[in-house]
Design a protein with these regions (language model features):
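Short acidic, glycine/serine/threonine-rich helix-capping segments at coil-helix boundaries
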Residues: 1-62
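Structured segments of extracytoplasmic/periplasmic soluble domains
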Residues: 35-46, 58-65, 139, 184-187, ...
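Active-site-adjacent loop/helix surface patches within enzyme catalytic domains
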Residues: 92-239, 243
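Catalytic-site microenvironment of enzymes
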Residues: 2, 9-10, 42, 67, ...
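Beta-sheet entry/capping signal
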Residues: 21, 122, 148, 264-265
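Basic/polar, cationic surfaces and motifs that engage anionic cell-wall
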Residues: 62, 70-84, 191-294
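Catalytic phosphate/metal-binding cores of nucleic-acid and nucleotide-processing enzymes, i.e., regions
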Residues: 89
Length: 294
């Protein structure tokens, strides 16, 4: 593959520039390819010299950490989420839906289902490798992707589209069967200072994470308030959509039932494919057990 051609096409599609890797550089040449490799090695990525989706997400997080961040103080929250236009109560005090004036605007690809309720079999949990939910939605829009929910650093749940809409977040044939959430977490411990500087505090670290049979280097965990928000979202989707309070039988790897789309319940992205590691360290069964005990 011509890497220069690939990078130029990627830049036009996603909106990045050669100068983001080399100040003042404008060419999509071998020098840029080398600079992308250096960036990829520094971020634990496959160093192929091509700025694909994974490299782009890390690039955005790197650039965003140097920008001034203003935490939006909202005073008007919803007490429900929406499925086929109908409100579903949720036991959480910070919810902003796609119908609210202060919604995060998602423009990525999605499919609107009309005339009937689609059957949602399972709920897919992601981390976004972004510094905040606004940045996550920006990346999704540039990549022409979508998801039903985001959970921000302070626990705010954003609904980005109706749960009856098919969003593009889990890959191909999984999307019509599920809804999903992107939980804000830049993943790499190098971003801890950004969180502390902007008033969120230091993130917990996962130091014993494993996925697909391999041990992981220490990475940042979700804040406790994000896990509480996730629990509230799981519970609302269980009650409103009838998704069973079940976790995959395979705890830290691809689950055969999830992969074959016969599973019904709550799972992580890595349960679908070996190509994903999110959300390693998230004990879904423990969250579901708390809901059962409520």
């Amino acid at each position: 593959m011509d890497k220069g051609f690939y990078n130029e096409a990627s830049a036009h599609r996603l909106g990045w520039e050669a100068s983001w890797f080399i100040p003042g550089h404008t060419e999509y040449d071998a020098k840029l390819t080398k600079a992308i490799r250096v960036f990829q090695r520094a971020h634990g990525l496959s160093a192929d010299g091509m700025c694909g989706p994974s490299t782009y997400r890390r690039l955005i997080a790197d650039r965003d950490q140097h920008k001034e961040y203003t935490c939006f103080e909202n005073k008007d929250y919803s007490d429900c989420i929406y499925y086929a236009g109908q409100p579903i109560p949720i036991e959480w005090d910070k919810v902003i839906t796609h119908l609210d004036d202060n919604a995060l605007k998602m423009t990525g690809k999605k499919k609107t289902v009309t005339g009937k309720k689609r059957k949602v079999k399972y709920f897919v949990t992601h981390w976004d490798v972004c510094l905040n939910s606004e940045s996550c939605v920006r990346v999704l829009n540039r990549r022409n992707l979508s998801v039903q929910f985001c959970i921000d650093n302070d626990g705010t749940i954003y609904q980005l589209c109706d749960m009856n809409d098919i969003a593009y977040h889990a890959g191909g044939s999984h999307n019509p069967n599920c809804v999903g959430v992107e939980i804000s977490n830049a993943y790499y411990p190098k971003y801890q200072n950004w969180y502390k500087r902007n008033g969120f505090g230091e993130r917990p670290l996962v130091t014993d994470g494993t996925v697909h049979g391999s041990s992981m280097e220490p990475f940042m965990d979700f804040y406790p308030v994000q896990k509480e928000a996730l629990k509230a979202l799981y519970k609302a989707c269980h009650i409103g959509l009838g998704i069973p309070l079940e976790a995959p039988k395979t705890k830290w790897g691809v689950d055969p039932e999830v992969r074959k789309k016969t599973f019904r319940g709550f799972c992580s992205h890595f349960h679908l494919t070996r190509g994903k590691i999110d959300c390693a360290g998230l004990d879904i069964e423990a969250i579901l057990e708390q809901i059962r005990e409520d």
